[in-house]
Amino acid sequence: MKNTLFHRLKRPIAAAFVGALTTLAFAPYQIWLVALITPALLLILIHGQSRRQAIWTGYAWGLGQFASGISWVYVSIAGFGGMPLAANLFLMGALIAYLAIYPALFTWSYQRFFAKATLLNLLLAAPALWLIADWLRGWVMTGFPWLWLGYSQIDSPLASFAPIGGVELLTLLLLVGAGAIAYAVIHKRWSMLLIPTVLLSTGYGLSHWDWVTPQPDKTTKVALIQGNVDQNLKWLPSQRWPTIMKYTDLSRENWDADIIIWPEAAIPAFEVELPSYLSNLDSAAKMNQSAIISGIVNQAEDGQFYNSILAVGLTPYGDYSFDLTERYHKHHLLPFGEFVPFESILRPLAPFFNLPMSSFSRGDFVQPNIVANGHPMAPALCYEIIFNEQVRQNVTDDTDFLLTLSNDAWFGRSIGPLQHMEIARMRALELGKPLIRSTNNGLTAVTDHRGKIIASIPQFETAVLRAELTPTQGQTPYHQLGSWPLYIWVALSLALAWWRKRRTNA
């Protein structure tokens, strides 16, 4: 009986281990080749399994991947949730168990419809089904597209495909390569290993191609203020003015910058409470031929709260006034952090469901760029930068930079902020726009239009990042077309693989 149980569990156990190894492909480890090997091992593990066996193998792979890959979420739950250890572990386990459903959906659907390890199934059907599972994970219940495999390739030769089809194209190419490796191992057809080799070589060749044109005549000096404010103290009434003056004093030392940027919710007060201060800040920035961008919390006349971005100083908005139509309001809110699903049921249960600032309203999906000192910027607040389609649709022909403000203090010294930066870099590469990322305690950095970090400052330090950024002109294919070519590819691949299967079985 023990031998039978071990026989049943050995593949799921192996899958969980392989899934956990996948985290090594992402920041801060960035062993990008792992993202090619671990999906191949998953395809090999489900070979010859029944649908029921495959679903558990895929689920175990997902448990391993997300238990290791999003372990940083526990830092926030334990540090700010106000619940006992058992409740913290339960919530973390529930999140991991939910996310593992999507790899299980992939393995079940593959074994259900394309069980045979044919070349067509592994190179077309498997990548298509993987993308569908990823899309569902990025959409269901507001979506959580973290750890999409393509993000791990930001520094690999495959990164050159990102301006063509975005991070999803990189995921597709990884799965095509993984399918070829699995086919080679299962059928001992080692010539199939040429496929991932060709993909990587093609990516290297594409790295010399630039889809957009830099505009050196519009080079801009920016100063990013990293306040390093303790999250436990930030919203205490006694800390309001010390925090505000900290950012103000650091800005005064950098008035020679064209644009000074503060992080998400840098001002620990409602905008409506600070009209005199903001008016004076606006005047000071104008006097110094500069502009300041900051995250701030807003309350509208109807009582709704917004996580917002404002710009003062040299802007097209005129003298400072409390006008919410001239602000960017965060659209994609963080579940439980900025809104609570099933609010009336969950809020009374535990402090975790009643965190400060967890009743925000959404801004529009597409909003005007923030303009500072003549430079339009496509904004994304914190978590929004992981939603590629939202960022893409907010970039216009006039956009000079991508702007993302964040506060990753919730996640301490975990790997979460490093993965967050990795994702932000991908947005710059996809859209061919330099990226400005200003945070409370790191990672604060700027990148060029290829997603390469130009300058950064260490985490957990009060510091100012000075850099010069060069805007670009033109559009990448991904900016123009989005993911539609991939949707078509997925449909055609599944249709072709299904037709071939029916013809073979006839």
From Swiss-Prot:
EC class of the enzyme, as a word: transferase
Domain CN hydrolase span(s) in chain numbering: 225-471
Keywords: Acyltransferase, Cell inner membrane, Cell membrane, Membrane, Transferase, Transmembrane, Transmembrane helix
Signal peptide: none
Major subcellular location class: membrane
Cell location: Cell inner membrane
Coiled-coil regions listed: none
PROSITE patterns (alphabetical): CN_HYDROLASE (PS50263)
InterPro entries in the record: Apolipo_AcylTrfase, C-N_Hydrolase, C-N_Hydrolase_sf, LNT_N
Main function: Catalyzes the phospholipid dependent N-acylation of the N-terminal cysteine of apolipoprotein, the last step in lipoprotein maturation.
NCBIfam families: lnt (TIGR00546)
Name of the molecule in the record: Apolipoprotein N-acyltransferase
Organism for this UniProt entry: Vibrio vulnificus (strain YJ016)
Gene assigned in the entry: lnt
